[in-house]
């Protein structure tokens, strides 16, 4: 399953020994894109997301801007298959953007291929920095998952997928205390795509200007530091950790070490390095039904 020959497999230099410039470089995904310049890669990603969302809203049965809480921006977009039923698998997506950019309104990449196969897709908005704190984002995402379970109690499984910062937020749901939400979500799978799971390095990069994370904040919100001790809600719930070949060495290290930590616990974890894709293509390609990751997601849901 794993091929370690990719250009970005973990650096032999521990991040704490890197220069400030190198650490910044490692945690700037657009600098590792080989097919386009950094700025163009970001523009292309946004454009593909906007086009996919516009198409999904125009052609799929949907409920848009549904509030899952009372806070500003606490909304989800729900896209349904043609067959009307509440007994569906639900796929929740949390966008990336280093917890400070991105939007549900440009993140419906996977709606067409998944709804075509009978999966409801929920694109989740959360309050990004600098207005929103990371603790609050984690709370929002937790409430969005509880909301879907309460609204669709006859679901055939809830699957959480996050990209980059969104993968971190999805991973935090492995640690969630559902008792205070009055519901235990029917979590059946996690897809953690090019994520960051130990937030300590972020404290020392320019990304922290908006986030304003203290070391304590970073540690409290690092699933890498906590997941080994957590008990799986359901030992059959699958956790897939995915990274792109052209992700940076630090992104590779983060994903590989998180996978290893999951394995040390009782989690049903697997790891995939996807060939010939970068940090952005890995999600852009979810618009395609024959894409490797799209197929992995569908097989996991319908196995």
Curated annotation (Swiss-Prot):
Documented EC number(s): 3.5.1.9
Entry's Gene Ontology molecular function annotations: arylformamidase activity
Reactions it catalyzes: N-formyl-L-kynurenine + H2O = L-kynurenine + formate + H(+)
Keyword annotations from UniProtKB, A to Z: Cytoplasm, Hydrolase, Nucleus, Tryptophan catabolism
A single BP term in Gene Ontology: 'de novo' NAD biosynthetic process from L-tryptophan
Intracellular or extracellular location(s): Cytoplasm, Cytosol; Nucleus
Location of the active site: 164, 247, 279
Pathway of action: Amino-acid degradation; L-tryptophan degradation via kynurenine pathway; L-kynurenine from L-tryptophan: step 2/2
Superkingdom: Eukaryota
Gene Ontology CC: one annotated term: cytosol
Subunit annotation: Homodimer.
Family statement drawn from the similarity comment of this UniProt entry: Belongs to the kynurenine formamidase family.
Function: Catalyzes the hydrolysis of N-formyl-L-kynurenine to L-kynurenine, the second step in the kynurenine pathway of tryptophan degradation. Kynurenine may be further oxidized to nicotinic acid, NAD(H) and NADP(H). Required for elimination of toxic metabolites.
PANTHER family tied to this protein: AB HYDROLASE SUPERFAMILY PROTEIN C4A8.06C, KYNURENINE FORMAMIDASE
Protein name according to UniProt: Kynurenine formamidase
Organism the protein comes from: Homo sapiens
Name of the gene encoding the protein in the UniProt record: AFMID
């Amino acid at each position: 399953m794993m091929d370690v020959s990719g250009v970005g497999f973990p650096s032999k230099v521990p991040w704490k020994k890197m220069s400030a410039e190198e650490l910044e470089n490692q945690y700037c995904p657009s600098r590792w894109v080989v097919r386009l310049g950094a700025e163009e890669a970001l523009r292309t990603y946004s454009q593909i997301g906007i086009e996919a969302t516009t198409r999904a809203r125009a052609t799929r049965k949907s409920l848009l801007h549904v509030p899952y809480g009372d806070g500003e921006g606490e909304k989800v977009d729900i896209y349904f298959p043609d067959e009307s039923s509440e007994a569906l698998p639900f796929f929740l997506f949390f966008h990336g953007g280093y917890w400070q950019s991105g939007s549900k309104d440009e993140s419906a990449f996977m709606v067409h291929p998944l709804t075509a196969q009978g999966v409801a897709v929920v694109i989740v908005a959360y309050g990004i920095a600098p207005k929103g704190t990371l603790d609050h984002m984690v709370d929002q995402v937790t409430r969005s998952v509880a909301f879907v379970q309460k609204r669709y109690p006859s679901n055939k499984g809830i699957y959480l997928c996050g990209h980059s910062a969104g993968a971190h937020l999805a991973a935090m749901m492995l640690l969630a205390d559902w008792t205070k939400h009055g519901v235990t979500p029917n979590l059946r799978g996690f897809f953690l795509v090019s994520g960051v799971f130990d937030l300590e390095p972020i404290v020392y990069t320019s990304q922290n200007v908006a986030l304003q994370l203290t070391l304590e904040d970073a540690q409290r919100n690092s699933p890498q530091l906590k997941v080994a001790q957590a008990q799986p809600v359901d030992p059959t719930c699958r956790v897939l950790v995915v990274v792109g070949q052209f992700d940076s060495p630090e992104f590779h290290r983060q994903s590989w070490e998180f996978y290893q930590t999951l394995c040390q616990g009782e989690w049903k974890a697997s790891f995939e390095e996807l060939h010939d894709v970068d940090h952005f293509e890995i999600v852009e390609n979810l618009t395609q039904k024959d894409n490797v990751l799209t197929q992995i997601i569908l097989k996991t849901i319908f196995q």
